[in-house]
From Swiss-Prot:
Residues 616-628 have a biased composition (Gly residues). This is Heat shock-related 70 kDa protein 2. Residues 613-636 are annotated as: Disordered. The gene is HSPA2. It comes from Bos taurus. The lineage of its organism: Eukaryota, Metazoa, Chordata, Craniata, Vertebrata. It is found in: Cytoplasm, Cytoskeleton, Spindle.
Length: 636
């Protein structure tokens, strides 16, 4: 454990998140205040407060338009992205565009607010950080955060920014399947048998990754990775929701689509049915008064569910084939197939995968919901210098998921770094001018596998100016690509003759939050946090005065006190209690000090009378009323 306190590992998921810490030589996956080891990645805004996690998900049907989830499907993407546009059809909340970036729009405390996906994710991260702090009994400053292996550069950078907004020092961004491989590898430590080829099949709530690693003596080397950053359990839910909404329309001639609350209740029922279908062959759905007073009772079979998602399920095998090709391995050379992510519990997916590998047994030894956070916690411990023997000789060699290069004449993509190159890495290539006396070159950086840049993703661009006039082909411009351990790219271009250089951290110029934006969001996050705390204190003060009032009322109405308290005193207390109860009904939203003041007012009336009780019945004892209530003394 370092002097800075422990570092945590956070699996920031599309639908659920999970946090772990490595201490005393083992990983603890930390339960939240509800006792759950995973926390919904949900943030809700109401007239009075902001809710995160279980509390947010539990009220989603009552407040569908202001409850945000799936931020991971927005993060690092542009508003025009086809996936964003198609997701918006399923989301009950509003997504708007600001400078080409998507933002969610909600009503909070009576005002319209908009948030970037990074801000929503940072709220979920804040919740995970607080869960860890409650368990560890102290502040947490540093964390390793995981992302899908197939996340591109902008999605990685945006996730890192979310961590910064939370106030965390993000030690490293690591890939989810790699983190899961650590969990698997540590679990198997000490088993004999040298190098092992392991395929991690990670299908979660919103993303899908396949990674192939070789594991030997604590060295985890990723050979290839493939996936789909937009495929997961949510998509299987969507198929069922559409199917059942159609059935409702057929049976009852009513379309529930415009009613967001009805759609949300149907989605919750579908999610539950989907889980049931992993262990049973049929699930019943019963929703009272789904729409316009009509109950919806139906059932769905496992076979029907599999048919609705047949294409999506089959589609999970394509990345498996691609990863095998890239790793130059035959499927017979894979020794272990490890399942990660909640959606791998679906029997059909297990069957397809097992059949693809000619009936080979799948490895289900690690917890699919917790493995990623487990691995992240181990990596966090290594990065802060934990000296436990279990993690000392552990080495992670990860890869970049997409080829990176620049545009050359004619819109051709010239890759400098090929996909599945081990990171960190640095590659330099020399380019030259295209026309005589050209004084500047535009360096445009792309990621992707297509031959022409127009089909790939532009990460950013910059000019290198001041090139001395010369015939075409003479100047030598050296372009260097440097990828750090987070998988984030830096590019420099230098003119060899003048030594002039220009550089850019590809943190996606177009989509990236500026430093000022991030600083502003850090302050806002602090402000929201203190507002949340103030609200918690306010509610506590309200509850305190409420319970005090009812307790006092019960006390004086108790039969046992008959004859010990005069009717006049009793009525005085009961009248005051009733007055406070009426005031509370009218002032549910008062400030903390108003509640405290009300409680003091009530105490001023009650304490002298209650003290008299303790001093021997009506009028007994000369206890002064100003003593401020009963004091307790030790009896010898």
């Amino acid at each position: 454990m370092s002097a800075r306190g422990p570092a945590i590992g956070i699996d920031l998921g599309t639908t659920y998140s999970c946090v772990g810490v490595f201490q005393h030589g083992k990983v603890e996956i930390i339960a939240n205040d509800q006792g759950n080891r995973t926390t919904p990645s949900y943030v809700a805004f109401t007239d009075t407060e902001r809710l995160i996690g279980d509390a947010a998900k539990n009220q989603v049907a009552m407040n569908p338009t202001n409850t945000i989830f799936d931020a991971k499907r927005l993060i690092g993407r542009k508003f025009e992205d086809a996936t964003v546009q198609s997701d918006m059809k399923h989301w009950p909340f509003r997504v708007v565009s600001e400078g080409g970036k998507p933002k969610v729009q909600v009503e909070y405390k009576g005002e319209i607010k908009t948030f970037f996906p990074e801000e929503i994710s940072s709220m979920v991260l804040t919740k995970m950080k607080e869960i860890a702090e409650a368990y560890l009994g102290g502040k947490v400053q540093s964390a390793v955060i995981t992302v899908p292996a197939y996340f591109n550069d902008s999605q990685r950078q945006a996730t890192k920014d979310a961590g910064t907004i939370t106030g965390l020092n993000v030690l490293r961004i690591i890939n989810e399947p790699t983190a899961a491989a650590i969990a698997y590898g540590l679990d198997k430590k000490g088993c004999a048998g040298g190098e092992k080829n392991v395929l991690i099949f990670d299908l979660g709530g919103g993303t899908f990754d396949v990674s192939i690693l070789t594991i030997e003596d604590g060295i985890f080397e990723v050979k290839s990775t493939a996936g789909d950053t937009h495929l997961g359990g949510e998509d299987f839910d969507n198929s069922m929701v559409s199917h059942l909404a159609e059935e409702f329309k057929r049976k009852h001639k009513k379309d529930i689509a415009p009613n967001k609350r009805a759609v949300r209740r149907l989605r919750t029922a579908c999610e539950r049915a989907k889980r049931t279908l992993s262990s049973s062959t049929q699930a019943s759905i019963e929703i009272d008064s789904l729409y316009e007073g009509v109950d919806f009772y139906t059932s769905i079979t496992r076979a029907r569910f599999e048919e609705l998602n047949a294409d999506l399920f089959r589609g999970t095998l394509e990345p498996v084939e691609k990863a095998l090709r890239d790793a130059k391995l035959d499927k017979g050379q894979i020794q272990e197939i490890v399942l990660v992510g909640g959606s791998t519990r679906i029997p059909k997916i297990q069957k397809l995968l097992q059949d693809f590998f000619n009936g080979k047994e799948l490895n289900k030894s690690i917890n699919p919901d917790e493995a990623v956070a487990y691995g992240a916690a181990v990596q966090a411990a290594i990065l802060i210098g934990d000296k436990s023997e279990n993690v000392q000789d552990l080495l992670l060699l990860d890869v970049t998921p997409l080829s990176l290069g620049i545009e050359t004449a004619g819109g051709v993509m010239t890759p400098l770094i090929k996909r599945n190159t081990t990171i960190p890495t640095k590659q330099t290539q020399t380019f030259t001018t295209y026309s005589d006396n050209q004084s500047s070159v535009l360096v445009q950086v792309y990621e992707g596998e297509r031959a022409m840049t127009k089909d790939n993703n532009l990460l950013g661009k910059f000019d290198l100016t001041g090139i001395p006039p010369a015939p075409r082909g003479v100047p030598q411009i050296e372009v260097t690509f440097d990828i750090d351990a987070n998988g984030i790219l830096n590019v420099t271009a230098a003119d060899k003759s003048t030594g002039k250089e220009n550089k850019i951290t590809i943190t996606n110029d177009k989509g990236r939050l500026s430093k000022d934006d991030i600083d502003r969001m850090v302050q806002e996050a602090e402000r929201y946090k203190s507002e949340d705390e103030a609200n918690r204190d306010r509610v506590a003060a309200k509850n305190a005065v409420e319970s005090y009032t009812y307790n006092i009322k019960q006390t004086v109405e108790d039969e046992k006190l008959r004859g010990k308290i005069s009717d006049q005193d009793k009525n005085k207390i009961l009248d005051k209690c009733q007055e406070v109860i009426n005031w509370l009904d009218r002032n549910q939203m008062a400030e903390k000090d108003e509640y405290e003041h009300k409680q003091k007012e009530l105490e001023r009336v009650c304490n002298p009378i209650i003290s008299k009780l303790y001093q021997g019945g009506p009028g007994g004892g000369g206890g002064s009323g100003a003593s401020g209530g009963p004091t307790i003394e030790e009896v010898d």
